[in-house]
Amino acid sequence: MSGQKLTAANLVSAIDSLKKNVNYNYVNSSNTHTIQIVHVEKPEGPIKIKRGDTETSISKQAIWRLADALSTGEPVNVDRVFGASYNFRSALEALLAHTPEIYWCKLQRIQPGLNKSEVVEGHKHIIWLPDRPHEKGVMKEYETDVVISEIPSNNVVYDALSLPSTHSEIDIDVKRRHVQIQIALSAIGFQLGFRTWIARNDQGISYGDKKIADLDGIVQKIESEKLISSFDGAVQAAMNIDCIWFRNGKLMPAVMEVEHSTGVRSGLARMKQLKDLLPPYANTRWVIVAPDEDRDKVFKEANVPMFKNLDTQYFPYSAVEELYSLCIRRKLTNKAVNEEFLDCFMEKCVM
């Protein structure tokens, strides 16, 4: 059972099974306030709760963030998942701890010192144990001798972007995130010895003090890539693909479309159009890169019969930024890891 993952829909369904308008305690016994469930929007949230006289919502995105952190039998510090700025985190933790498959636990923690480390009482965690459900509506502590050594969280920092002023404010936020992920993908590619094609329309965007087209490892003309230009219609089909990795002029490790939920099908269609114009290159991944909360949408669309031959892989934003951070911090290169290393961060979609 180890390694099983949860989705936002799983967490929402579990919380929805609890009684509404009943007072639920926090995991931290020093917090004497209580929480009530007001309304649960299925399948993935939001969840409206009441604390005292105040109503607030736990967003779909927040629920997905915690779901993505939970695996069978692995303790999770909810405070670290969200950071101190999220005031709903303890409420979400508490509600889940009242569901049968989630326990709370307190781990011993390794406290580093100047000359030696010592084991001290640690912070509260939650742990998902689907094989040993407890009574619904009550919290149950899981007794464990596990000792944890907490490593600092790693932030991903992007330079300023200068986007065209032809979008609405909401569109600009979506486009900014889209381009940030393209930047991360190109940086990953550069570290691993790939050259990266970024969609023609995005190459003129300013990132820091450079155009994207001038960043390290960027392919400025798709026409120069023989793997594409040797086949009728392929250059035009590749022109607006968000990201393509090339290696040694002989390999194409990945073709990637960066999409939000409304664009998943169109991204698959663009990749299929390109794939149908090319020979069956070995070890090319056809990848949808999308927010973590859009996983179900990606899987559903990838299994539509017309797209099944893409054998699509899903590369969530969180995994992109985890790999980006790792590449930058540890200076990973293709001498240290092979292309199969990428598959650790992606998930096969086709059933």
UniProtKB/Swiss-Prot annotation:
Known EC number = 3.1.21.4
Question: Which keywords describe this protein according to UniProt?
Answer: Endonuclease, Hydrolase, Nuclease, Restriction system
- Lineage: superkingdom: Bacteria
Q: What class of enzyme is it?
A: hydrolase
Tell me the Gene Ontology biological-process terms attached to this UniProt entry.
DNA restriction-modification system
Catalyzed chemical reaction(s)? Endonucleolytic cleavage of DNA to give specific double-stranded fragments with terminal 5'-phosphates
Q: Which GO terms describe its molecular function?
A: type II site-specific deoxyribonuclease activity
Function according to Swiss-Prot or TrEMBL: A P subtype restriction enzyme that recognizes the double-stranded sequence 5'-N(12)RCCGGYN(12)-3' and cleaves on both sides of the recognition sequence.
Descriptive protein name:
Type II restriction enzyme NmeDI
Q: Which organism is it from?
A: Neisseria meningitidis serogroup C
Q: What is the lineage of its organism?
A: Bacteria, Pseudomonadati, Pseudomonadota, Betaproteobacteria, Neisseriales
